[in-house]
Curated annotation (Swiss-Prot):
The keyword Ligase does not apply. Binds 1 Zn(2+) per subunit. Pfam families: Ribosomal_L34e. Keywords: Metal-binding, Ribonucleoprotein, Ribosomal protein, Zinc. The keyword Endoplasmic reticulum does not apply. Zn(2+) binds at residues 36, 39, 72, 75. GO terms for molecular function: metal ion binding; structural constituent of ribosome. It comes from Thermococcus kodakarensis (strain ATCC BAA-918 / JCM 12380 / KOD1) (Pyrococcus kodakaraensis (strain KOD1)). Gene3D superfamilies: 6.20.340.10. Belongs to the eukaryotic ribosomal protein eL34 family. The lineage of its organism: Archaea, Methanobacteriati, Methanobacteriota, Thermococci, Thermococcales. Its cofactor is Zn(2+). The gene is rpl34e. Residues 41-72 are annotated as: Disordered. One of its GO terms (biological process) is translation. This is Large ribosomal subunit protein eL34.
């Protein structure tokens, strides 16, 4: 085993070969799930993947198709309400 693979930053995937041997394939771990910028809740509709994997996805699959895709829906509503209320009073 190469010294670089000894660290646990590489995921160990056990693969059975056609010859019947079990070998270890090393692959990078998936990053953590995306979180809301305001409250920190996990975001739905944002895939977990390394940048090289996400690069292959179309733009609509990388993030939600709504205003403020970096916020969860409830925080997005709060921000939009605050903007509207600020524009009414100004």
């Amino acid at each position: 085993m190469k010294p670089m693979y000894r660290s646990r930053s590489w995921r160990r995937k056990y693969v059975r070969t056609p010859g019947g041997r079990t070998v270890i394939h090393f692959e990078r771990r998936k990053p953590k799930v995306a979180h809301c910028a305001m409250c920190g809740r996990p975001l739905n509709g944002v895939p977990r993947g390394r940048p090289s994997e996400l690069r292959k996805l179309p733009k609509t699959k990388k993030r939600p198709e709504r205003p403020y895709p970096n916020l969860c829906p409830s925080c997005m509503r709060k921000v939009m309400k605050a903007q509207v209320r600020a524009s009414i009073t100004a």
